[in-house]
């Protein structure tokens, strides 16, 4: 959400638009039951282009697009139906997740890693597929068997449940967990912090963040008081790049209605930060990234 909003702000600033109901604005539903009321509020303010972030908004945005044919609608993180005033922006989550799998495989000492997803969906499947393929391909090169544990929280806002799942994985010898669970993911960081605060800095467990650079969430004090960080790396989804691209197209009269714009490593919609990765591991990640861009590594979006 923050990244998409940044893209809107970037476009607005460059085109002398004012933040507010006469230029560009940001509306946040309290929960899924509030989606329709929030969309109605946006429609009342007479914006010409309305962007919905997250695949759970799809039914409401599709309905609004059909009922308001003179307005442009955009869905982020899912494929839209072929409606002339509705475009969609999707991301090759499997590409970033594959790189996270490479990073995890080359970093793990316990040969056990975990994956925690928000809920069961096609979009979440792409994270799982990419991560497992990245770990598997790297483990073959390392001539090691690396176990991948995978669990789903059930939603994107249950911090306590995600914490308990992560705690269980760490107890079962996982030393790295990749979380793609939205707000629920905060629980994974909480569990890692609890483990790490009781251990010397050299015996830490790690978290791989998603959507944005989550380095700050990994700050902690190790046993003995030494400040450290346990965010291994983060898979970045650059919705800001995609939204600004779309806004520029729309301003030129080329709104891509009925189309899906797909962003991955090649067009800078997905990336992975170096974070706390060793130089050796970072080089392995960069080589895998280039092979994906060149089409030499093919990643399935589901398993």
Provide a role label for each language-model segment.
Residues 1-303:
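A residue-level marker of the well-folded mature domains of exported/periplasmic proteins
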């Amino acid at each position: 959400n923050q990244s998409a909003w940044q893209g809107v702000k970037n476009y607005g600033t460059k085109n002398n638009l004012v933040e507010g109901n006469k230029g560009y604005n940001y509306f946040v539903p309290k929960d899924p039951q509030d989606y329709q009321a929030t969309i109605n509020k946006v429609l009342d303010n007479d914006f010409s282009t309305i962007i919905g972030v997250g695949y759970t908004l799809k039914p409401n945005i599709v309905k609004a697009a059909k009922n308001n044919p003179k307005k442009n609608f955009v869905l982020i993180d899912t494929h839209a139906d072929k409606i002339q005033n509705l475009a969609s922006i999707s991301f090759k989550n499997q590409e970033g997740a594959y790189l996270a799998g490479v990073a995890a495989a080359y970093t793990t000492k316990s040969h056990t890693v975990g994956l925690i997803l928000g809920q069961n969906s096609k979009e979440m499947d792409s994270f799982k597929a990419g991560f497992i393929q990245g770990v598997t391909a790297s483990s073959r090169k390392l001539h090691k068997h690396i176990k991948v544990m995978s669990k789903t929280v059930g939603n994107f806002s249950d911090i306590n449940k995600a914490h308990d799942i992560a705690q269980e994985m760490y107890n079962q010898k996982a030393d790295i967990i990749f979380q793609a669970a939205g707000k629920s993911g905060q629980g994974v960081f909480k569990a890692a912090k609890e483990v790490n605060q009781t251990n010397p800095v050299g015996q830490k467990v790690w978290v791989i963040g998603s959507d944005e650079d989550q380095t700050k969430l990994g700050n902690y004090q190790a046993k003995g008081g030494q400040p450290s960080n346990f965010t291994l790396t983060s898979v970045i989804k650059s919705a800001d790049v995609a939204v600004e691209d779309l806004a520029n197209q729309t301003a030129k009269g080329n709104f891509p209605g009925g189309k899906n714009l797909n962003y991955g490593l090649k067009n800078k919609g997905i990336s992975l930060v170096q974070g706390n990765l060793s130089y050796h591991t970072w080089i392995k990640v960069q080589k895998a990234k280039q092979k994906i861009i060149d089409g030499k590594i093919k990643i399935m979006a589901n398993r």
